[in-house]
Amino acid sequence: DRLRSRGLGDVYKRQDKYPDYVSRPEGDDYYWLNPSRSEVRELIADGVVEIAENYDVDGIHIDDYFYPTTAESFDGQAYIEASADISLADWRLENCSEMVKSIYEAVKSVDDDIIFGISPQGNVDNNYSQMYADVEKWCAESGYLDYIAPQIYFGYNNDVCPFTQTLERWERMVTNKEIKLVCGLGVYKLDRENEFIRNDGIIASQIEDVLSDGNCSGFALYSYASLFTQGDRSGGRFERETQAIYSALN
């Protein structure tokens, strides 16, 4: 709550030389660092170095938070100052890619054995139209990440992103053999979406698909705790789900 009201945002806003390093989009409760500014990207990379140097970590992982809005006002002034010869959308894609690259380089500058990965939205199109995350570039070129773990939190019959087709799309994008694909699975949906509620064992089936596929290096569950702390515990349903997952792994 401090960061929402009087924290990071106010610290930057009080300094005239940081006019738009932190922005708060209209209707948003949060302050957001502006990735269009090189100083902001450096600040984030420095934070990663601090973690890697001072803590015994195996990796650095970031979630699907990139641009919080499509509104031009968020970084319009920086775009004007940049005199970019590309569209605002393409410029934002470049900003996020520069940020991701700087994090990767920061990690490797400390210890090349520390891995860096990202868990972007599973809906590929949303990454481009809403988040300005150039996931295809990161999956194809070296120097951005070691693994990608898209949030493929969809059932097989999802109207927009059915699981099998979405997984296949991600597999086609990961063309760099040095980058591992880890499939994110939405355990939290077991009591939130009809397909998961009406059909036992969907997560277990998805695990089997991923492990038998040959193009994925593994899977991640979001959130693992959901198997034990969430939802209606009557009827033994969650016990059946956990047993099905266990069976899929053995």
What is the predicted function of each stretch?
Residues G9-D10, E72-F74, G231-S234:
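Short aromatic-enriched loop/helix-cap "lid" or pocket-rim segments at secondary-structure transitions
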Residues K13-E141, Y153-F154:
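Polysaccharide-binding and catalytic clefts of secreted carbohydrate-active enzymes
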Residues S142-V160, W170, K177-N250:
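Substrate-binding cleft of secreted/luminal carbohydrate-active enzymes
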Residues D1-Y12:
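Single conserved hydrophobic/aromatic residue that forms the stacking wall/gate
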Residues K101, G122-C139, V160-V174, I202-Q206:
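Alpha-helical scaffolding within the catalytic cores
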